[in-house]
Amino acid sequence: MFDFAFAIPLMRRAIYPGSFDPVTNGHLDIIERARKLFDEVIVAVAHNDEKQPLLPLKERLDLLRETAGKMDNVRIAQFKGLLVEFARAEKAGAVIRGLRAVSDFEFEFQMALMNRKLDAGVETIFLMPKEEYTYLSSRIVKEIARLGGDVSGFVPPAVANTLSKKFAPSHS
């Protein structure tokens, strides 16, 4: 029997980038599995002046620290600019990307090829979430919360609490 775990040398450091607006149970599933493959996983929150996230950067970082930051070998960070430059600065040899469905693949594949062109020393590793999270996205979670739905099955408790406050009806 072939033991696959011994066939792959442990890469030292990987980056799992995203906007995490907000972090979902699907994100946490990818983080949990990625941390078993690498010595360190840096969960990197992208700061993009062109986008208007629901949650400010500091709040996204705080929620990630509360939910994933306590995991062994996981570090929460932020970055602005090119991901491969951040990876180079952090001496990371891999970028982790989650693929929920075939529809994610085309975009992620193009990004992986572009990142390889920019820096051939950074590999992209695709991980699929557990089946129960394949439909889950931050966008869908925000829409459910905005419409008054219960998101507690899709996000950690701290995130559900934050979203319920964010979308609470105002009593004017």
Which functions belong to the PLM regions below?
Residues F2-S172:
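Nucleotidyltransferase catalytic core that binds NTPs
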